[in-house]
Amino acid sequence: MNAPKPVVLCILDGWGLSDDKTANAPYLAKTPTFDAIMTKGPHARLITHGPDVGLPSGQMGNSEVGHTNIGAGRVVAMDLGQIDLAIEDGSFFDNAALRDFIARTRAAGGTAHLMGLVSDGGVHGHLNHIIAAAQAITNAGVPVVMHAITDGRDVAPKSAYGFMAELEDRLPKGARIVTVTGRYFALDRDNRWERVQEAYDAMVRGEGRRVSTAHSAIDYAYNQSESDEFITASVLTGYDGMRDGDSLFCLNFRADRAREILRAIGEPGFADFDTGARPALSALLGMVEYSDAHNAYMTTVFPKRDIVNTLGAWVARHGLRQFRLAETEKYPHVTFFLNGGKEEAEPGEDRFMPKSPKVATYDMQPEMSAPEVTDKFVEAIGAGYDLIVTNYANPDMVGHTGDLKAAIKACEAVDQGLSRVIAALEQAGGAMIVTADHGNCEMMIDPETGGPHTAHTLNPVPVALVGGPAGVTLRDGRLSDLAPTVLALMGLPKPPEMTGESLIT
């Protein structure tokens, strides 16, 4: 039997499965196409958290982890666990890059600036890592100031008081908090430079909303109806910015949301907004590598590990053509992360990236750019590609707003797109795996607080096969089983590095 063409992997980002229907956007939405996929064809469930995706037990998955595991076809040990272990066994404190950072700062007579997400969400960073870094640096006699980025997205929307109190309690002598900024500003990833500039001005220039303490920054924000994610850049009394000879250590271990603020601080010739005269920093260090471009002006504590023979690399090695599609919010996931942290496209790999809508939050436009994604998706199905990988961002990005009605609309927008995609797929004679990278919008109300739930979940995600071989079924599995399944549909062997197994039975 001939292999179907194209073979499609469609990722509904943040679309989880839950038996609790109370605030379950996919369940409450009118999704006739998805419902038909899950009732008429082969379907199963995938685990997206904890050791099954290379994370510590109980740690929720996320889009970076999910797409990395999907593309690798094997369980990839993620940075969170590696960093935790290095702190636990003491090797973090002896790391050569960290020691060099300390030596350069001390030689310049500077202050070490730490920047990181202050929560235990474990998606972009972790409070424990901030404390370890502060201890290592202050133990060497170098003063430390902390640029605290509040979360409210991977943890409860108004949990900053507790995390800030823990940070203040655990910071060693010689370290203090000097700015408090919501991640909406400091961790943008969609070229909203006006947001990034607010964070930059506070951290680098010491300009922003003036407050006396970190807690008063949160107080003021809550009085202005700003939840943690949206806290206006606030500068504590006595801080007036970075100086020549100072240094910066970014503690975030996920690349996509750290890139823009680091570019503004360190990239030679940066011109996306007026930074003013930037200080001559003695050192710029990252917990991980953020991109090849960042490597030109930063060092790293944990260099990138090569993931060889990813799905994309293996398909390219067999001389086949592939297409990657997502709007800008999720574009790095179907390219950089799916390709194992590699920026460049594989030979024969084409890409398209519709711009995400320019709105303050995506509950204001829950359809996002799904119509344009679908237009290009349908076009690609008829264009002769062997493999197509598409990500619909809506369930995750709107799920993060905590707005149930908007999340329902987001799911419905995706379902409308799926209807058109399946029609095109049937006409072309292709096959498609529909799945998700983690849960989110199936839990829009926090069961503990009764308030909005904005974080990812530990729930399983769907996996379904459309247009596959007759009579097959799918088994339950994990994300690393998806690439071997795709290769099986394409009639290709899997590379020896892929330890995942095809879901088709």
UniProtKB/Swiss-Prot annotation:
Keywords: Glycolysis, Isomerase, Manganese, Metal-binding. Mn(2+) 1 binds at residues 396, 400, 456. Its cofactor is Mn(2+). The active site is at residue 63. Transmembrane segments: none annotated. Mn(2+) 2 binds at residues 13, 63, 437-438. Binds 2 manganese ions per subunit. GO terms for cellular component: cytosol. One of its GO terms (molecular function) is phosphoglycerate mutase activity. It catalyses: (2R)-2-phosphoglycerate = (2R)-3-phosphoglycerate. GO terms for biological process: glucose catabolic process; glycolytic process. Its EC number is 5.4.2.12. Coiled coil: none annotated. Substrate binds at residues 124, 153-154, 183, 189, 254-257, 330. It comes from the Bacteria. Pathway: Carbohydrate degradation; glycolysis; pyruvate from D-glyceraldehyde 3-phosphate: step 3/5. Monomer. Catalyzes the interconversion of 2-phosphoglycerate and 3-phosphoglycerate. Belongs to the BPG-independent phosphoglycerate mutase family. This is 2,3-bisphosphoglycerate-independent phosphoglycerate mutase. It comes from Ruegeria pomeroyi (strain ATCC 700808 / DSM 15171 / DSS-3) (Silicibacter pomeroyi).
